[in-house]
């Protein structure tokens, strides 16, 4: 097990690392609260390249714990704002949990550097998915019905597998999946996605925790920072609901930049 929090307290360099972890958590939480995704897809690069975690599997396991907790915080804010469609969330998350457990088992068997390279390639694909649906406003009355339930279940299972394999909450995949399968507005998809993000993250976190791939001290700091960031992100998302297209373009750009950097670092060795 990894308990770095207790071992580094009192050292100047450790204080700097703790601040980096706290601020990284704020970024993760803010992104989750803002668009329901992106927290985990940014958490792993932040842990590896900013905080300096040397083990990719530890970064993935720790990010899963942090993102799940931050997603729950963001979900509370969205639930109070009544932007969560609970039936859709339950169907999507229940199918995704099984996929996440399968994906996590497969991910731990892959070399860390190769895993990061595959992760970056997935990020690019997700960025294009976001850009593709940036102008769709959706239907405010959209619900999960007998007709679209199979699509919701299929998207949930596939997203869960990818979530577990890469240790991500899957929000960037869940939001497009919910919109594609139910045609709900992006603000509802953001709130609803956090149920699945939390469920996928917990499933992945448990799998990695049992293998000793969780740094609990770092996770605690990410959670504290993420809780603050989630609240701020949710407030901004409600104000910018009408400008979701511009917001989507911006975050897709961030994803492309981070993915390019990760590919360069992975190929550089």
Model-identified regions with their sequence ranges:
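Juxtamembrane transmembrane-helix boundary motif
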Residues: 1-31, 44-56, 76-162, 180, ...
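Transmembrane helix boundary and interhelical junction motifs in multipass membrane proteins
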Residues: 35-44, 167-177
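Small-residue hotspots at the loop-to-helix junctions and early N-terminal turns
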Residues: 56-60, 186, 190, 194
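Transmembrane alpha-helices of multi-pass small-molecule transport proteins
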Residues: 62-76
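Short hydrophobic/aromatic, small-residue-rich stretches within specific transmembrane helices
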Residues: 63-67, 193-197, 218-223
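A general structural signal for well-ordered alpha-helical packing
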Residues: 174-175, 195, 199
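Helix-helix packing/entry segments at the starts of transmembrane helices
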Residues: 189-196, 246-252
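Membrane-helix boundary/interface segments in integral membrane proteins
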Residues: 204-209
């Amino acid at each position: 097990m990894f308990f770095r929090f207790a071992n580094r307290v009192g050292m100047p360099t450790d204080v700097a690392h703790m601040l980096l972890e706290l601020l990284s958590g704020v970024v993760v939480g803010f992104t989750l609260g803002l668009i329901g995704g992106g927290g985990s897809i940014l958490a792993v690069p932040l842990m590896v390249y900013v905080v300096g975690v040397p083990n990719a599997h530890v970064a993935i396991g720790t990010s899963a714990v942090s993102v799940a907790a931050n997603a729950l915080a963001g979900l509370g804010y969205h639930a109070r704002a009544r932007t969560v469609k609970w039936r859709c969330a339950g169907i999507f998350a229940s199918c995704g949990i099984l996929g996440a457990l399968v994906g996590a088992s497969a991910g731990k068997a892959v070399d860390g550097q190769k895993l990061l390279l595959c992760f970056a390639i997935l990020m690019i694909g997700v960025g294009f998915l976001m850009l593709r649906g940036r102008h769709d406003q959706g239907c405010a009355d959209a619900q999960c019905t007998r007709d679209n339930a199979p699509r919701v279940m299929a998207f949930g299972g596939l997203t869960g597998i990818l979530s577990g394999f890469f240790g991500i909450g899957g929000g960037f995949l869940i939001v497009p999946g919910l919109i594609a399968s139910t045609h709900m507005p992006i603000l509802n998809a953001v709130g609803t996605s956090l149920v699945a993000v939390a469920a996928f993250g917990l499933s992945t976190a448990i799998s990695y925790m049992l293998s000793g791939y969780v740094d609990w001290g770092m996770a605690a700091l990410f959670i504290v920072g993420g809780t603050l960031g989630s609240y701020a992100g949710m407030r901004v998302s409600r104000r910018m609901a009408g400008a979701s297209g511009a917001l989507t373009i911006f975050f897709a750009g961030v994803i492309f930049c981070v993915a390019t950097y990760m590919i360069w670092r992975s190929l550089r060795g």
